[in-house]
């Protein structure tokens, strides 16, 4: 995982402020002025503990995504929420993910001794495509009725491949748990979004992770949220 300017500066013997950081996919335009204004307007609240239920935030996110706040759980960045998701994935016989993959996925899966395997995306003339070996293994899993999990990010990091929503539908039909990391979805025009948030209510085996880090350029705020069945989120919160 990139973005550790203090560490890089110590190696280069310079100030972190002079380093141009290309190691993390953060929006180069910086945080929205409205976000900075909101932070400044609430500085006085730093002396008080926040609401542990984050009800105002959950309500605002619920209005934005048109979903009940009980289906939303804010976290200490998407990384914390991915950790809890990987704990649930570790309960499956095996979890698959497309590779190359964001390094934090392997970290979180290993933390719970999850059995997992990668399926390589293959470079083709018009972009990166799902390998035939994955399709064959998927058919074997269907035949053996194994308890299988799947973890993917959409758009995919680092290839930039955007998967159609129909791929997730196919996964939901035969995977015990599907976790979709949509950290980069907001970089797309709304007309090109392939988010599956609107399917969560009909699919208890679906978890969607969102982040304010990448598009809104707020990595220091450490804010992400999960959208999933309330029973799962209550278990995570405990």
Stretches found by the model and what they are:
Residues 50, 62-84, 98:
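Short loop-beta-helix segment that forms the pyridoxal 5′-phosphate
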Residues 117, 121-190:
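Active-site phosphate-binding strand-loop segment of PLP-dependent enzymes
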Residues 88-110, 122, 132:
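Conserved PLP-anchoring active-site segment centered on the Schiff-base-forming lysine
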Residues 1-48, 144:
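N-terminal "arm"/small-domain region of PLP-dependent enzymes with the aminotransferase-like
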Residues 17-18, 68-72, 93-94, 182, ...:
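Short acidic capping loops at alpha-helix termini that bridge into adjacent secondary structure
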Residues 53, 201-238:
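Conserved core segment of the aminotransferase class I/II
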